[in-house]
């Protein structure tokens, strides 16, 4: 199986966690795009979706899936999203696609977080993938200096503005042994909107596309 075929297998496997007549939280990225294709096959059986990015919103609307504003929704039974890295404790680095803040908000509302990845995203220790940090533009230099103090090497992601109008610093050379602690430390820096560590709200179910098929892990 190619990497994309493994992503597709994981995306379609997530359909079984979608409840009839529910509103589904939908993430962002290449693996999620396969899930959206799958979700479209049962759009008559769900009420609709809440999206974590403009890109996913456009794709779902094009496929005829109703998209709701999160503020109009009381609860989400499930949120389906990918990850850039995930460890054995279901802690993740997300935000390679710059949608981390909205992803984190939707994940917080959902009762269950189903993470869909191919097997290249599984790691023992988080941090080889640079950690994205969403930052208010005027605070960029200050936040970068604070991230250096935490042992990271922040790089401004040129030409990228988030859906919220902010910028991204990608932090390299972090060996993240305590993801929850680092998530709090970075979020405490003035000017940080949030960072791509999903440790305080990790995944509940992990679906991994492998050459042998989809493997399921639960927290």
Swiss-Prot record:
GO cellular component terms listed in the entry, alphabetical order: cytosol
Catalytic residues of the enzyme: 103 (proton acceptor)
Keyword set includes Isomerase: yes
Gene Ontology biological-process entries: D-ribose metabolic process; pentose-phosphate shunt, non-oxidative branch
Pfam families tied to this protein: Rib_5-P_isom_A
Record InterPro entries: NagB/RpiA_transferase-like, Ribose5P_isomerase_typA_subgr, Ribose5P_isomerase_type_A
GO MF term set: ribose-5-phosphate isomerase activity
EC number: 5.3.1.6
Keywords linked to the UniProt accession: Isomerase
Catalytic activity as recorded in UniProt: aldehydo-D-ribose 5-phosphate = D-ribulose 5-phosphate
Residues that coordinate or bind substrate: 28-31, 81-84, 94-97, 121
Highest taxon listed in the record's lineage: Bacteria
Main enzyme class: isomerase
Keyword Zinc applies: no
Pathway annotation: Carbohydrate degradation; pentose phosphate pathway; D-ribose 5-phosphate from D-ribulose 5-phosphate (non-oxidative stage): step 1/1
Function (record text): Catalyzes the reversible conversion of ribose-5-phosphate to ribulose 5-phosphate.
Protein family according to the UniProt entry: Belongs to the ribose 5-phosphate isomerase family.
Record note on quaternary structure: Homodimer.
PANTHER family reported for this sequence: RIBOSE-5-PHOSPHATE ISOMERASE
Name of the protein: Ribose-5-phosphate isomerase A
Organism of provenance: Shewanella oneidensis (strain ATCC 700550 / JCM 31522 / CIP 106686 / LMG 19005 / NCIMB 14063 / MR-1)
